[in-house]
Amino acid sequence: MPTINQLVRKPRKSKIEKSDSPALNIGYNSHKKVHTKLAAPQKRGVATRVGTMTPKKPNSALRKFARVRLSNLIEVTAYIPGIGHNLQEHSVVLIRGGRVKDLPGVRYHIVRGALDTAGVADRKQGRSKYGAKRPKG
C-alpha cells in the first residue's frame, strides 16, 4: 500500500482498454500509403486461404476458417459459421468482430450472405445470423 506522498509524486496509471478486434480499428490511405485511425463495424477483405482447423481440448471437430487480407492490408484469420460454405481463395468477404473460444488466434467472423459468401442453405431458424432467405410457403 503506497503512502499519500508516494501517490502525489507518482499517481496511479489508469488501465488501457484493449480492443477485442484491433484490425477493425485501422484504416488505410492508399494514396499516402499510410495506416489511419478509422473504427468500422465490418471490413471487406479477400480470402487468401480457406481450410479447416482443430479446436483446443476438450473439443473435437474440423472448424472451417479463412485467412483474409483486409482492405487495410492487415491479414487476419476469420471463422466461417454455419454448415457448408462456398468460399474459395480470392473470394471477397465481409468480416465482423467476434472470437471463437476454442480456436486460438481466431478473433473475427465472416458475415454469411454478404458479398461472395452465400447464406446457409435450408436454414429455418436463426436465419439472420446465417444470411438465409425466408422459406416460401
UniProtKB/Swiss-Prot annotation:
Origin organism lineage: Bacteria, Bacillati, Bacillota, Bacilli, Lactobacillales
3-methylthioaspartic acid carried by residues: 102
Example of a GO cellular component annotation carried by this entry: small ribosomal subunit
Function: With S4 and S5 plays an important role in translational accuracy. Interacts with and stabilizes bases of the 16S rRNA that are involved in tRNA selection in the A site and with the mRNA backbone. Located at the interface of the 30S and 50S subunits, it traverses the body of the 30S subunit contacting proteins on the other side and probably holding the rRNA structure together. The combined cluster of proteins S8, S12 and S17 appears to hold together the shoulder and platform of the 30S subunit.
NCBIfam families: rpsL_bact
Protein's GO biological process: translation
Coiled-coil regions listed: none
Molecular function as annotated in GO: rRNA binding; structural constituent of ribosome; tRNA binding
UniProt keywords, alphabetically: Methylation, Ribonucleoprotein, Ribosomal protein, RNA-binding, rRNA-binding, tRNA-binding
Organism per entry: Streptococcus equi subsp. zooepidemicus (strain MGCS10565)
Record has Ribosomal protein as a keyword: yes
Region Disordered: start-end pairs: 1-21, 34-57
CDD domains: Ribosomal_S12
Similarity remark: Belongs to the universal ribosomal protein uS12 family.
Any Pfam family hit: Ribosom_S12_S23
InterPro entries: NA-bd_OB-fold (IPR012340), Ribosomal_uS12 (IPR006032), Ribosomal_uS12_bac (IPR005679)
Protein name (record): Small ribosomal subunit protein uS12
Subunit structure as annotated in this protein's UniProt entry: Part of the 30S ribosomal subunit. Contacts proteins S8 and S17. May interact with IF1 in the 30S initiation complex.
Name of the gene this protein is made from: rpsL
